[in-house]
Amino acid sequence: MSEFSQTVPELVAWARKNDFSISLPVDRLSFLLAVATLNGERLDGEMSEGELVDAFRHVSDAFEQTSETIGVRANNAINDMVRQRLLNRFTSEQAEGNAIYRLTPLGIGITDYYIRQREFSTLRLSMQLSIVAGELKRAADAAEEGGDEFHWHRNVYAPLKYSVAEIFDSIDLTQRLMDEQQQQVKDDIAQLLNKDWRAAISSCELLLSETSGTLRELQDTLEAAGDKLQANLLRIQDATMIHDDLHFVDRLVFDLQSKLDRIISWGQQSIDLWIGYDRHVHKFIRTAIDMDKNRVFAQRLRQSVQTYFDEPWALTYANADRLLDMRDEEMVLRDEEVTGELPEDLEYEEFNEIREQLAAIIEEQLAVYKTRQVPLDLGLVVREYLSQYPRARHFDVARIVIDQAVRLGVAQADFTGLPAKWQPINDYGAKVQAHVIDKY
């Protein structure tokens, strides 16, 4: 998990002092990718200057650049990448002029982004989650066993810091790559619809379904392992509560819980956003069909029916059940006959008109908790209030009580990232999910 020990001014001064900069036009980036590809084929991971020049020649030919100055331009490109810390150059006195080059971590990171991280793999994600689950279980067992400071550093903190956290970051990177792929798919669909939307419908449907399936597969894999991961993190957290000198472990566990929550939450949110985009595309296609002036679809259907016996086809259709409105539409017309006439004093009195009065009463009653610094259990308080009102008013009263309660303070348990338990608040199945408010 990424942690910065320096402040922002220190990092800025450090970058300025070392003159860090990255400039990779498309030809230089292509050259770097070519170097990484050729480097991956070598067992020693080393390349000579002649091999780099050969790689540059391939890139130069692909960009249709002149070959007369290939040596000078290749030398400039190599020196520029060494200056930008994308390549490391090693020379020796015995072999002067015959340098050896190796990719730096920065160069590997950039090329990995463009080459090795482009495809989503459920198997890779499953293996990562399996490794994380094993590491967390061993760390939780070690935490419950207890021991000296060396034991906590070696068997709990180190696996969490250097294995679990890094895999979480890798999964987070996979999600961000999926975000980028979604945007690319959207651009592809937009281009297809702009060119020839009639011919592009099948292609759009394929792109939509493939992306939706990949997102769902990713989320299902995460959710299947999420509960076990959280359970082991909670075991470690419980074990550290009795020790005052393990703040570094507790802080790391909290960071991991937050990271896992963000990963799972964003996975579901990205699915919801994609579903909305899917509906938007289908709505556009339906609108285009409705506005089809040339009746292309009608002509195609007529032709398909006429040539059915020569070229048989199958028709698949969906027919959803109709939603029936069970309200009595004539109720409004005979409202007076059913309810009779209200007394003049009550004719205009509705629940929303006494809402402010009720809210003031509840606010005054709940203020006692803040004055006495007593924890406020929303489940018990709401249930007590609802018992005083008819069932028809339960929703409105519960909303008022909760609105007034959350203004008094917050629950420290909310900052743990763990969901609260559902508590029944009436005898009709209504429930509320909220931590005890203990900080005013």
Swiss-Prot record:
Protein's GO biological process: cell division; chromosome condensation; chromosome segregation; DNA replication
Region of interest (Leucine-zipper), residue spans: 208-236
Protein name: Chromosome partition protein MukF
Keywords: Calcium, Cell cycle, Cell division, Chromosome partition, Cytoplasm, DNA condensation
The UniProt record lists the keyword Amino-acid biosynthesis: no
Gene3D superfamilies, per database record: Chromosome partition protein MukF, middle domain, MukF, C-terminal domain, Winged helix-like DNA-binding domain superfamily/Winged helix DNA-binding domain
UniProt xrefs under CDD domains: MukF_C, MukF_N
Annotated Pfam families: KicB, MukF_C, MukF_M
Cellular localisation: Cytoplasm, Nucleoid
TM segment ranges: none
NCBIfam families: PRK05260.1
Major subcellular location class: cytoplasm
Purpose of the protein: Involved in chromosome condensation, segregation and cell cycle progression. May participate in facilitating chromosome segregation by condensation DNA from both sides of a centrally located replisome during cell division. Not required for mini-F plasmid partitioning. Probably acts via its interaction with MukB and MukE. Overexpression results in anucleate cells. It has a calcium binding activity.
GO terms, molecular function: calcium ion binding
Subunit structure: Interacts, and probably forms a ternary complex, with MukE and MukB via its C-terminal region. The complex formation is stimulated by calcium or magnesium. It is required for an interaction between MukE and MukB.
Family: Belongs to the MukF family.
Gene name as annotated: mukF
Source species: Escherichia coli O127:H6 (strain E2348/69 / EPEC)
GO cellular component terms given for this protein: cytoplasm; nucleoid
